[in-house]
Each structure stands twice: as C-alpha cells, then as structure tokens.
C-alpha cells in the first residue's frame, strides 16, 4: 500500500468519526460533503465509452455517479445515431467527444482523491457557530485532525497550497486530461460547426455536457479525438487534376495569399482535407489543378495556384532513364553480336573447304519465315477486323429499337438554332406509310471529331430509353449518310420561355392559376420519370421545355444556344458554359450534379413560370449571381404568386440538398392544387 492509499484510509476514518459525531446532533451530513466516500476518480467500467475509456480513471463530480453519467450518455448517443443532420465525416468524432467531455481522465487519480478528501476535512473544520455542544464536538474533530496531521509523514503533500482551492471539485479545478483544445476548436468551428451548435442547445445532449473549447487549457498532454490535418510538406507537385494534392503551397498564381477554407466554405465537413488550413487544394475536382480563395477588390474569388504538375517535372527524368536503359541494351547487344561473329569466324576457318549443298537462294533471306509472319499478320488483321465488326454489331443492336430513315426521307425547312453537336432544324419526315409529319432535326456538324461522333451516338442510346408523355421523344435517326441526324417530334409553340413572354401582361395577355399549375405539373411529372430512371438533366430551365398545342409541355435538351440565351450561361474558371442562375451552390463550386440539384433548378423554373419568363436575378452579372447564391440571397416571390407555391420554391432551394423535396412529393402537391383549382373553375363537374 503506497503512502497516498494509506492516507486516504486514515482520512476516511477521521471523516467517519467526524460524521458520526455530527450526525448525532441532526446536522445534515451533506454540509460536510460526505456524499461520495469513494472519491472523484473512478475506474471506468461502463459500456458506452468502452472503446475510448476502458480501465481508465475518469473524473466524476461529487454530485453525480457513474451510473448517472452512463444513462445520460446512452440517451445522448441514441439521439446522435438517429440524427439526419449529422455529416458522415463528423459522426465518427461524436462519441469520443461526448465521452471525453463528460468524463475527463485523471492524470494522478490517487493524489486527486487524496486532495478531495483533504478538502472535505478542511471544509468540515471550517464550520462554526452551530451550537455550544456542536462547538465541543467540532473541537474534538479538529483535535483528531490535528493529531493526524502531526503523525502524517505526508502532511506537506496534502495540507499545503496544492490543495484544490475550489469545493466541490470541477473539471477546471482538478488535474485532469481533457480534450485537446486545437482539435476541439476544429470540431466546433470547422468540421462539425452545425452539429456542434445543435449539440450545445439540445436538451438531451446538453445534459452530458459539451466542452466549451475556449475554456480548455493549452496542454500537450491531452485527449486526442484523432482529427488530423492532411499535409505532406514534401509534396511539391500534383498528379492529374490535383484533387489528391496535400502540399503546403498557400499562395495563388498571382501572388495573393490564400484565405482559410473554413471562412468561405459552409459545407467544409464534406471535404475534411480542408480543415484547419489555407493550403491550395482542389476539393471535388472543381478545377483542373489546385486552387484557393483570395481577396480581390472587395470580393473573394477563386484563383489557381502556381504548382507544377508531377508529370511535367519527372518527364526529363523518365526520358533520361529510358535513354540510359536503351543505351545499356544496345551495348549488351553489340557485345553479344561481336562474340557470335568471333565464334562464327573461327568456325568458318575450319570448314571453309567443305562443299555445301545447293539451297534455295532465298534461304538466307528467310523468305519462308517472312511469309509465315506475313500470314500471321494477315490472321491478326482479320482478328482485329472481327473484333471491330463485333463492336459495331453490338452498337447496331442497341440502335435497332430506333426507327432508321434516309436523308431522302427528310426535308429541311428552316433553322431553329445551334447546339453542341450542330444545328437544329424544322423539317418534314416521310414515314413508311407515305404520310409526312413535322419534326425537329438535330444534325451532327460536318467534320465532327471522333469523340463528338461517339457522344452523338451515346445520346441516341440514352434518349431511346426515355418514353413519357412529358419528355420530347426521339422518332428516329439518320445514320446511313452524313449529316447524321436525330429526329424529334416538333412542338408548335416553341420553348416555354418564349411562350410565357408572348402570353405575359406586357403583351396584353395573361395565364390563369390553373394554367400555371398545369404547366408546372407536367414538368414535375417529366422530371419524376427522369429521376426514377436515375437520369440527371443538369440544365432544367424554361428554355429547355417545349410547348405544343393544348398547353402540352414536354422537357427537352436540344441544347439550343441561340444569341437570345447566351446570357443564361457563364464560363466558370475556363470550364464549359454553365447555367449558374439555375444551379445550387454545390453544382457551381464542386461540379456536383444530382437529382437534388435538378430539384433546385425546378424551383427556378417554377419562379420563371409565375414571373412570365423573366430571367432569374435579372440585372445582376453572372459572377454577382454566384455570390448571391452562395450567400443565400434567394429569389423573391413573383407578383400574384400564391404563398403555397412560393413556399414550395423555397423548399426546392434548401441549402442542404438532402432536405429538398423529391419530384414525387412535388408532383403530388401540384396535382392536389391543380385538382382544387380545376374543381373551383368547373363547379358543375
């Protein structure tokens, strides 16, 4: 038994006798702080924190028990497991954070318990003016403690200035190992900013006690949550697009210092490689190389960093190494050839008088071998031709379900616009039954690259699978002769954007609420079909919806980029043109296109419908629009737009993509509203 253990036993005996005497006079023992005779540092034997606190001495406040804390932790962890607001990268730190916050580890458990009992004794000693009898009793207690002090060999260890100055003891007053302050601040301010704020306010999690990072001491001997900042100081170049770059470059190509990522990116928890730093990175492969945010004339913009590509740096080394290897092989080959010639020359001197039989004059030219090789090449060529033929047959089989026409069956009437593949025309199609119908013709431009031709055929394969009354369906193709064409049903009233403008109050016309809902419902049902087939549109807008007679609306993607729509697209950091006014922040910043981003776009289309085709964020430049979307400056309600419809728009523009409604939910709501308006407009039905 060490000296601290012996002292605890002795102190406990003194307190026991003191408590007995005092208790006989009906004095509440809680005044003396005797609730917990086992001290405040306990060996953890629970289940919730077993993985991080097993067999550790943990601090338990005198007014609580280990069972109390265990029950609170169970309840709090149950809330966390069921929470849908918890990011996956944040969830892994939730339990260690709760365990370390509620039960920090005692650095010196025996000494901490010793000081606790000494404080209890000192606290009992200081009670005065209870009664004369009590004073006599207290004098006896003080005498007992004084005798013990004199006999104790470790008196200076206990009854000295080292005794904790506060009673009851707290996490701040004791010698405890707590969460590392730097990791706590990263958790609270960057990686789990939203989750940490919710936890602090939550009634169940708050009962456990979440650490206030500002009050944590700066101490190297602390409890680590395992949060690591991914940095490799030796990495001075990047591979591919730089999404795996972890170097320490923190200056843009123009020489401006990079800003800390957490200052500008709200969803930093999706990219844990960005926490606690301002180094150049390429999260989500947004750019072609590492980049960062910089300050530029009152606004923060994206700039690429001046970091070399690893392939460029090692190119010379590769060429040099390859040249050296080739040179070595040449030298070895020359040596072998020289030795063989020497041997042959020596052998020929011995047999030069022997008469050789007559032979084919081509035997030294290996004519037969050459012929065999030629035959082999021929067979190999036939094999490659066979593989290519099979590939074409497979491609042809995928196109068999589409009607095929010749250019003689198609008559081009007028140009409608121009897209990525080429021009789009209005025309006439002669069908097998000798009747003609009006069609929209999407023609592949002349001298298109191999990749463009492949993309064109790939689009045919994709579109051929789409069959819905609110999707513009392909009628057939022309693939036997250039120009290759896709043939679509022709929509008489043009695109929805033009239709809305031509029926707006500025043209002396208007649409009813029933017509607005009819348009919106058809688009939502078309998108519901696409999303059910895991198809992401990426460019849903009024300009890409077509209107036929009878107010039939169908979704298309003809890629019409006429001059009147050029302002709807914006080139972000030298990438392809993007319709930023219809895109959520995750698509603009990270190039993340999903069904949820299509839902955002549908909300903007709904806004276009009720504003009669007005351009979203009219009057702002595209860069200003990006800043507005990132700062959650949403479009205001159009004039005469029903509150319920605008509320649906707001839901579609939820910052967290998972909280946006599905197209099924949207269609159900619009259908209910449409039926209500229809019944109100036709009471006799």
Swiss-Prot record:
Annotated GO biological process: cell surface receptor protein tyrosine kinase signaling pathway; central nervous system development; protein phosphorylation
Subcellular location: Membrane
Keyword Disulfide bond belongs to the record: yes
SUPFAM superfamilies for this protein: Kringle-like, Protein kinase-like (PK-like)
Tissue expr: Expressed in neurons of the developing nervous system.
Source species of the chain: Drosophila melanogaster
Residues reported to bind ATP: 416-424, 442
Regions crossing the membrane: 318-338
GO cellular component: axon; membrane; plasma membrane; receptor complex
Ranges where the Kringle domain occurs: 236-310
Residue numbers bearing the Phosphothreonine modification: 112
Protein name (database record): Tyrosine-protein kinase transmembrane receptor Ror
Alphabetized GO MF terms: ATP binding; protein tyrosine kinase activity; transmembrane receptor protein tyrosine kinase activity; Wnt-protein binding
N-terminal signal peptide: 1-24
Role of this protein: Tyrosine-protein kinase receptor that functions during early stages of neuronal development.
Keywords carried by this UniProt record: ATP-binding, Developmental protein, Disulfide bond, Glycoprotein, Kinase, Kringle, Membrane, Nucleotide-binding, Phosphoprotein, Receptor, Signal, Transferase, Transmembrane, Transmembrane helix, Tyrosine-protein kinase
Residues glycosylated per entry: 45, 63, 129, 144, 250
4Fe-4S in keyword set: no
PTM annotation (Phosphotyrosine): residues: 565, 569-570
Gene that specifies this protein: Ror
